[in-house]
Amino acid sequence: MGKNVVVLGTQWGDEGKGKIVDLLTEQAAAVVRYQGGHNAGHTLVIDGEKTVLHLIPSGILREGVQCLIGNGVVLAPDALLREITKLEEKGVPVRERLRISPSCPLILSYHVALDQAREKARGEAKIGTTGRGIGPAYEDKVARRGLRVGDLFHRERFAAKLGELLDYHNFVLQHYYKEPAIDFQKTLDEAMEYAELLKPMMADVAATLHDLRKHGKDIMFEGAQGSLLDIDHGTYPYVTSSNTTAGGTATGSGFGPLYLDYVLGITKAYTTRVGSGPFPTELFDDVGAYLAKRGHEFGATTGRARRCGWFDAVILRRAIEINSISGLCLTKLDVLDGLDVVRLCVGYRNADGDVLEAPTDADSYIGLQPVYEEMPGWSESTVGAKTLEELPANARAYIKRVEELVGAPIDIISTGPDRNETIILRHPFA
């Protein structure tokens, strides 16, 4: 009997999911992306060689692992084809192992133009999107006007829908944002070129998953971004446009929730965030700079510097509840090496002095101050440790306190970027 495991982020993204998915896929028959788009950036380091993936599931570097892109992913054909080419140049076979749902909404040039025009118009109040068209593509999907991958293979139907879409979006671009219109013929010609290249990779992803399940195969579902960026459960409106939480697994792949056996939540030993939005434990001092430098905190997709702060047990407790987390993976523990004192946020205090749990919208964070516990740090290195006993006593105490504060076990500890620099206390597929 196979096991079906979800791996997702429990903070604001960038928790180190790519490495863990790559590590665990040694046992998986297939890896599935079920939401998001090429706004994700999953970094893998294998024997010192770094690979960044945006759309292709992180199992692609494991020989024989099937990689699936489910219907919940918004797909930019140009970005996907560039990613395939880069991997193939490294000798990684992709096309025969990658399968894409024809129900994936397409991201085309007008989505990118709209995304960037909106952020430009917002000025200082911008959301902090990647500018890659993710939000506008999801809007078209929900408005039931979007083009999907399957439409690419019906030229006349595609052209008719594209014409209607460009009439609508070009009106907004030209008359509201004062930006140039997107050319119909150029967009159509590019799309038809994509169609020829994508057609061999089309498949009914839901049917593929259920066939694997019936044959007792292990399946991994790879989340993108983080739980606090979820369109419904995140710090709205500073969120992404998809469901980044465990519920998105079913809707974004066609694999029912009762088939899932284990949900692994990835969390950093501290907290980071890219772009705008509330961040109660954010640091603006030397410690924040230390975390950013030691943790190489720059976005894999945009290159933007990440905001850094202390570990926040409040947001993690919320993420554990909404995802029904089975166990946690604590990443980047080694970044805390060398600090005299480490802090953990255990609650938020408002102006009345009351200690609160995590709010559900951005405005409710205004005026909240973090309540901290302090613990002694450690001077010894944790880099590359492969057993719990190899860790300094204070690091072990920190791990134990995190478990106590959030009410979930830490099953995996990452002690470096390479897939081998990991302590596995309980294997999700065991």
From Swiss-Prot:
EC number(s) given by UniProt: 6.3.4.4
Cofactor(s) the protein requires to work: Mg(2+)
Domain of life of the organism encoding this protein: Bacteria
Organism per entry: Pseudomonas paraeruginosa (strain DSM 24068 / PA7)
Binding site for GTP: 13-19, 41-43, 306, 332-334, 414-416
NCBIfam families: PRK01117.1, purA
Cofactor binding note of this UniProt entry: Binds 1 Mg(2+) ion per subunit.
Pathway: Purine metabolism; AMP biosynthesis via de novo pathway; AMP from IMP: step 1/2
Amino acids binding Mg(2+): D14, G41
GO cellular component: cytoplasm
GO biological process terms, semicolon-separated: 'de novo' AMP biosynthetic process; IMP metabolic process
Keyword Cell membrane assigned: no
Residues binding substrate, per UniProt: A300, T301, T302, G303, R304, A305, R306
Residues reported to bind IMP: D14, E15, G16, K17, N39, A40, G41, H42, T130, R144, Q225, T240, R304
Descriptive protein name: Adenylosuccinate synthetase
Subunit and partners: Homodimer.
Entry similarity comment: Belongs to the adenylosuccinate synthetase family.
One MF annotation (Gene Ontology) recorded for this entry: adenylosuccinate synthase activity
Cross-referenced InterPro entries: Adenylosuccin_syn_GTP-bd, Adenylosuccin_syn_Lys_AS, Adenylosuccinate_synth_dom1, Adenylosuccinate_synth_dom2, Adenylosuccinate_synth_dom3, Adenylosuccinate_synthetase, P-loop_NTPase
Enzyme class: ligase
Residue positions of the active site: D14, H42
Lineage: Bacteria, Pseudomonadati, Pseudomonadota, Gammaproteobacteria, Pseudomonadales
Reactions this protein catalyses: IMP + L-aspartate + GTP = N(6)-(1,2-dicarboxyethyl)-AMP + GDP + phosphate + 2 H(+)
Function recorded in the entry: Plays an important role in the de novo pathway of purine nucleotide biosynthesis. Catalyzes the first committed step in the biosynthesis of AMP from IMP.
Keyword tags: Cytoplasm, GTP-binding, Ligase, Magnesium, Metal-binding, Nucleotide-binding, Purine biosynthesis
SUPFAM superfamilies for this protein: P-loop containing nucleoside triphosphate hydrolases (SSF52540)
Main location, first listed in the record: cytoplasm
